[in-house]
Regions:
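Extracellular/periplasmic periplasmic-binding protein-like sensory domains
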Residues: 263-333, 344, 399-416
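Sec-exported extracytoplasmic/periplasmic mature domains
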Residues: 62-73, 104-112, 128-136, 175-179, ...
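Beta-alpha junction/loop-to-helix N-cap segments that form part of ligand/metal-binding clefts
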Residues: 29-31, 52-57, 74-150, 159, ...
Length: 416
């Protein structure tokens, strides 16, 4: 080939590059190949002592993920497309050791992009070491004790305000009843709680408020009990002997049902009865019948909160499962949505960037109390509680705070 012909071809090549370069530049960089799915993982107590609550969380997670996937998935800017979510879900059998092992498996074998929490303070306290150790972003809606968030963890986020705040809210409401002339001062309190960090934090919250206002409150008995209580007689004999005006307890659904059934059989009565966040659950009310009337609950959510978001979720949950929504379902649903939103905000599946997006979460129009999700520096939300009271005929009234109240509290409980 002659030099002139070779030069001619080189010149043609350069001309073509010059012609198409602007077009290629206009198209921007080519997005990397997207994964087929965003893989989220969780381990829930689907059998064992916490099986009922674990099943509630399963339904909430699955409803949120179906809704996201029906809309095409999560938009991830790095790949310039929506990617559907795949949820890997294991049964931890309500066992702490199994829960830790399963979260290790989700990270090391299943190679999840992010993690959703289980249910119950003991389980969550145990298994959160795995996401922190491997630096995998994690959000839970089933663990409220401050102990979980006091360990300087950077990858752990929680959707439930603290149990200490729950106890303080309950005591503030009782003070309001005193100011309204419905409750005497000082009022004598019997407080019991499960022998876990959950129950200890509840009892401490009651004691702290008592020490701060001795003119209002006097604790006459402060007693722990073992989780999964089989016989409440000994515990309630102590409560009976204390001659308290108010009975406050912190218990899981099964223990609440056991304790209050025996409470009723013994003919006990107090001006106010509360089992902390328990009392309004349909399963418990069905089991206890009219004995559950007038119990006061301090909780993280209610379908009766007067917001569009709460109403919309209650309706979609009822349609999906043909049963009423409770806080377990709502918080699980919102937990999954918060994780999806963090991935979308990060615009990538990079775990550090998703973690950073979670830390900066400011999600408006949420169904949580107050309508906003954000996390404090320790990773825990700090929104308000809503207080409810069981009313005769299976009805429920929101009683506190005034911004959401639908009825006045019945205090004292009517004598039967």
């Amino acid at each position: 080939m002659s030099i002139s012909r070779r030069m001619f071809r080189i010149m043609i090549g350069l001309a073509l590059v010059g012609l198409f370069a602007p077009l290629l530049a206009a198209c921007g960089p080519v997005a990397p190949a997207a994964p087929a799915e965003i893989v989220l993982g969780t381990a829930l107590p689907l059998t064992g002592g916490q099986a009922r609550e674990g099943g509630y969380f399963k339904k909430g997670y699955e409803l949120a993920i179906k809704e996201i996937n029906d809309a095409g998935g999560v938009m991830v800017k790095e790949y310039n497309k929506k990617i559907p979510i795949k949820l890997i879900l294991y049964d931890d059998k309500s066992d702490n050791t199994t829960s830790v092992q399963l979260y290790e498996k989700l990270v090391n074998e299943d190679k999840v992009h992010a993690l959703l929490g289980g249910y119950g303070t003991p389980l969550i306290s145990s298994h959160t070491v795995a996401p922190e150790k491997y630096q995998v972003p994690y959000v839970n809606g089933g663990g409220a004790t401050g102990e979980i968030y006091a360990r300087n963890m950077k990858y752990i986020f929680g959707m439930l305000a603290s149990i200490e705040k729950l106890a303080h809210t309950l005591m503030d409401w009782m003070a309001a009843q005193q100011d309204a002339g419905k409750l005497k001062k000082p009022v004598k309190i019997a407080v019991v709680g499960e022998n876990t960090s959950h129950g200890k934090e509840f009892r401490k919250g009651v004691q702290d408020k008592t020490k701060a206002a001795p003119d209002r409150f006097q604790v006459v008995i402060d007693e722990p009990f073992e989780l999964n209580l089989k016989d409440a007689d000994q515990l309630l004999q102590k409560v009976k002997g204390a001659n308290a005006d108010v009975f406050l307890a912190d218990a899981r659904i099964a223990d609440y049902t056991t304790i209050h059934r025996r409470y009723t059989e013994m003919g006990l009565s107090h001006l106010i009865v509360s089992y902390g966040p328990r009392g309004t659950e349909k399963a418990a009310r069905d089991a206890l019948g009219a004995a559950a009337d007038y119990i006061v609950s301090c909780n993280w959510w209610s379908a009766d909160i007067p917001t569009q978001e709460a109403k919309a979720f209650a309706e979609k949950y009822q349609k999906a499962y043909n049963e009423p929504a409770e806080w377990f379902h709502a918080l699980a649903y919102e937990t999954a949505r918060v994780m999806a939103k963090a991935i979308e905000t990060a615009g990538t599946l990079d775990k550090v960037k998703v973690r950073d997006a979670l830390a900066k979460t400011d999600m408006k129009n949420s169904l949580v109390v107050g309508g906003r999700v954000w996390f404090e520096a320790n990773g825990q939300i700090n929104n308000d509680y809503v207080m409810m009271q069981n009313l005769p005929g299976g009805k429920l009234g929101l009683i506190y705070p005034k911004t959401v109240a639908t009825t006045e509290a019945v205090v004292p409980i009517p004598k039967k």
